[in-house]
Amino acid sequence: MKVLILVLLGVVILQAAPIRKVENLLPTRNPPQNELVYWCTYANQCDFCWECIHGICRNRIQADWPVIHQNDWIINCTVSRWNGQCHYYEGSQQYLHHEMDCINPTSHTYPHTEYMKIYERDDL
């Protein structure tokens, strides 16, 4: 009986303990390279997710995204992580703040993708 109680107590403790500790990340405009997939899924309009050459931009992470013209849809962002909460701040003048549980990410794509200026071959 005591063994059963100890086993059950151990299971409860293991379930209550966090499985993975995520390190804090101070506010940055350049998240670590190994975290770009995460941040660019969460905040895909951030400038660190795009590579722009001569006004034509490609998404660095998501190859299936369209090639777009460099425009206001791509914005400056600052990202951070503290105590399991992930944050990103969009814009350089007036910040919009988004927050989520890092383990359960939610995309906050704003402005919506219909504001992207998709590059067409006829645009040359």
UniProtKB/Swiss-Prot annotation:
Signal sequence range: 1-16
On whether Lipid biosynthesis is a keyword of this UniProt record, the answer is no
Q: Do you know which InterPro entries this protein is assigned to?
A: ASFV_fam_110
Entry keywords, A to Z: Glycoprotein, Signal
Positions of glycan attachment: 76
**Pfam name, any one:** v110
What the record says about family reads: Belongs to the asfivirus MGF 110 family.
Per its database record, what is this protein's job?
Plays a role in virus cell tropism, and may be required for efficient virus replication in macrophages.
What is the protein name given in its UniProt record? Protein MGF 110-8L
UniProt source species: African swine fever virus (isolate Warthog/Namibia/Wart80/1980)
